[in-house]
Amino acid sequence: MTYEILDHESDIGIMVYGTTYEELFSNAVYAMADLILDVGKLKEKRKMHEIIRGNTPEDIMVNLLSRVLFYVDTYYTLYFRATCKYEDSTLDVYLYGSEIPEEVEYRNVIKAVTYSEIAVKPEDGFARVIFDL
């Protein structure tokens, strides 16, 4: 399993696993998408290239997931797979996903990615992210 769900007061969180920054960022994209919808029911039909910057790995995690959430809210497109390269405070990422079908039932409606309790620690094998619902 690449992630687990964390109960967090009125919010929800994820703990993702990986031993590199790239694994943690990619697994976080999948985990957040799977919190929103059952991604097993979607097929990859869209591809998007993004350059994400931040001062810290935690900034990049928040910026990356916020960008994925932007596409959900604005274009009704859910990106649920990512391939990426992390170097010098920059994440070069390709996102893969699908338009959200009209008849789909949302698991959770995520309003925002937060800095609350955030951690990105490949040396310890995990990253933690909390979302506002």
UniProtKB/Swiss-Prot annotation:
Keyword Calcium tagged: yes
BP terms from Gene Ontology: tRNA splicing, via endonucleolytic cleavage and ligation
Bridged cysteine pairs (disulfide): none
Residues making up the signal peptide according to the UniProt record: none
Coiled coil (UniProt feature): none
GO molecular function: calcium ion binding
UniProt KW keywords: Calcium, Metal-binding, tRNA processing
Pfam family, one: Archease
Residues holding Ca(2+): 11, 132-133
PANTHER family per the UniProt record, alphabetical: ARCHEASE (PTHR12682), PROTEIN ARCHEASE (PTHR12682:SF11)
Job description of the protein: Activates the tRNA-splicing ligase complex by facilitating the enzymatic turnover of catalytic subunit RtcB. Acts by promoting the guanylylation of RtcB, a key intermediate step in tRNA ligation. Can also alter the NTP specificity of RtcB such that ATP, dGTP or ITP is used efficiently.
Name of the protein in its database record: Protein archease
